[in-house]
């Protein structure tokens, strides 16, 4: 080691001094910048929402706004019915959509004959590309009248219609991510289960799905985010009444619908109240994501 | 060289609309008023060659746009509120419009009184049976909180109440809310038991029908004679020292040609 250093000192040192790696530094910076785009956007959106929405919180009071049940701008700004509508529609969509999606993913990854998988998979992928206004229109002309006939109610623009549309909308996200994570499992899991005498179906439910849990939960988290953030389709099928829904067969307005419907006109404290609706929505998404991340970590360990 | 040329061409193409927009008369505001002003702008452009830029953004923002000068002309489909009027802003009624109470064509009900309409929107009458129709629940459809049509409808029928000293709507919170005339029409056309309200000029007779109010048909004659009571003005707002190009467009709207276009579109002429 010492000899080596000596040789360096005596004459050819310039060959061994590490050249500043300009290209490396450059790309390092590019990577950092790219990674920061998302973070900076989020920070800007949050800052914007808080700076615009705080006025309404200050005037109406946090409790009054979050737990108030009457939305009567510009006097009362209670968004509790909308919080309830957002949570119920998302929960309903997850409860109905996720089982269907996970079973579809298992079918595609494990059971489907190739020709059938080649029909189902592109169909699911196509579903992801359909704009939400088309889902809304589909809901309005197919699901809404169907609910009117099935439940014999005067108007089918209800929470239930929203739940069904959202359940369909989250399918592609959950299916694609779940299928990928099931396929990514090492083949020894399944081989081991089968070698121990487990049936194919038993190995799917007891080995493959539990092993792919982390990926499936990621899919569910993205599905939840899509469902709670959906606006256009929901406005078209859910009736948008700002009252507390008594059942899923009554109209309701979600947080996103409230912002979208009134933002273009609102001024002053009314506009501020809409931004605070956005703050509440943001907080919910953060809580949901944190919750799912936590479950994910806990189960994996 | 080629690159520079194409860059220059692209730049010209990109900035051309900006130049064009600067030279045009800008009008923004009520979506109901913009329906007729768009047609007026088209014919005006044909006869004078001058461009008019019309944007439907809602009455409230139209009034703001006229006051702060974002648009040369603002449009409103309701009277200005006390806080909205300004000394340097002129108001001009260019047409009158009736608000029709609409139901699905399959609904046998033909007539409602003002009192019944008010009770329906307050959720005091909830079944068509109570107003002479079938034994079916009424599906009440209203517009979003800041629509000019809704504001006028509430004001004319007295669907207002005070909360903490601030006037707010007394339309039942359980009513369905549609965010535009198009959606109101879709909802009523697809539901036999729905009731809503819409500008008379936008009623599509194939799918929905306008009810008589207190026995009076919603027609131009009855609005002109003052018998049909649910009407509202279409107002243009502009600064006292109006841009000459905007003033010329306004003169055109009030001319015989302009006013007959107003009538053709289903609204009531003022001259």
Which residues are covered by each model-predicted region?
Chain B
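Bacterial N-terminal signal peptides that target proteins for export
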Residues: 1-8
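A ubiquitous, low-specificity "background" feature that marks scattered single residues
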Residues: 8-9, 52
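Alpha-helical transmembrane segments and their juxtamembrane interfaces
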Residues: 12-13, 149
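C-terminal segment of classical bacterial N-terminal signal peptides
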Residues: 13-22
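Exported/periplasmic ABC-transporter solute-binding proteins
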Residues: 21-271
């Amino acid at each position: 080691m010492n000899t080596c250093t000596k040789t360096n000192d005596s004459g050819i040192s310039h060959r061994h001094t590490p050249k500043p790696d300009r290209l490396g530094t450059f790309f390092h910076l590019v990577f950092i910048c790219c990674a920061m785009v998302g973070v900076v956007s989020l920070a800007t959106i949050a800052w914007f929402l808080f700076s615009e929405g705080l006025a309404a919180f200050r005037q109406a009071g946090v409790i009054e706004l979050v737990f108030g049940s009457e939305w009567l701008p510009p006097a009362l700004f209670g968004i509790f019915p909308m919080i309830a509508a957002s949570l119920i529609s998302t929960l309903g969509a997850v409860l109905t959509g996720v089982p269907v999606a996970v079973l579809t993913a298992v079918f595609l990854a494990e059971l489907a004959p190739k020709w059938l998988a080649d029909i189902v998979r592109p169909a699911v992928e196509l579903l992801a590309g359909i704009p939400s206004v088309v889902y809304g229109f589909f809901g309005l002309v197919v699901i809404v009248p169907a609910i009117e006939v099935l439940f014999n109610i005067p108007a089918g623009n209800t929470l239930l219609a929203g739940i069904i549309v959202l359940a369909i909308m989250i399918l592609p996200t959950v299916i694609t991510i779940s299928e990928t994570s099931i396929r990514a499992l090492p083949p020894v899991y399944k081989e081991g289960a089968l070698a121990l005498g487990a049936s194919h179906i038993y190995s799917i439910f007891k080995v493959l799905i539990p092993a792919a849990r982390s990926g499936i939960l990621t899919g569910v988290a993205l599905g939840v985010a899509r469902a709670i953030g959906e606006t256009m389709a929901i406005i078209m099928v859910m009736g948008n009444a700002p009252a507390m829904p008594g059942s899923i067969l009554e109209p309701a307005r979600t947080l996103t619908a409230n912002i979208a419907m009134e933002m273009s006109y609102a001024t002053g404290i009314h506009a501020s109240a809409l931004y605070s609706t956005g703050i509440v929505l943001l907080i919910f998404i953060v809580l949901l994501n944190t919750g799912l991340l936590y479950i994910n970590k806990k189960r994996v360990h | 060289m080629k690159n520079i040329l194409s860059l220059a061409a692209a730049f010209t193409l990109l900035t051309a609309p900006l130049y064009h927009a600067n030279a045009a008369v800008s009008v923004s505001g009520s979506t109901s008023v913009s329906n007729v002003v768009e047609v007026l702008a088209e014919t005006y452009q044909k006869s004078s060659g001058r461009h008019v830029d019309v944007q439907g953004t809602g009455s409230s923002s139209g009034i703001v746009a006229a006051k702060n000068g974002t648009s040369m002309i603002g449009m409103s489909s309701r009277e200005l509120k006390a806080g909205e009027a300004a000394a340097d802003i002129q108001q001009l009624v260019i047409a009158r419009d009736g608000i029709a109470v609409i139901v699905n064509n399959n609904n046998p009900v033909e007539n409602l009184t003002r009192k019944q309409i008010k009770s329906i929107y307050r959720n005091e009458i909830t079944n068509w049976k109570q107003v002479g129709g079938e034994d079916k629940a009424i599906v009440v459809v209203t517009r979003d909180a800041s629509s000019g049509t809704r504001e006028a409808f509430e004001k004319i029928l007295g669907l207002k109440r005070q909360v903490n000293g601030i006037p707010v709507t007394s339309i039942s919170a359980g009513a369905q809310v549609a965010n535009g005339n198009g959606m109101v029409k879709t909802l009523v056309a697809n539901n036999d038991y729905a009731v809503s309200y819409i500008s008379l000029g936008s009623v599509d007779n194939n799918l929905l029908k306008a009810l008589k109010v207190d026995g009076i048909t919603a027609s131009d004659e009855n609005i002109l004679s003052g018998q049909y009571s649910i009407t509202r003005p279409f107002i243009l707002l502009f600064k006292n020292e109006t841009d000459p190009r905007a003033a010329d467009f306004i003169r055109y709207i009030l001319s015989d040609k302009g006013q007959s276009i107003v009538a053709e579109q289903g609204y009531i002429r003022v001259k």
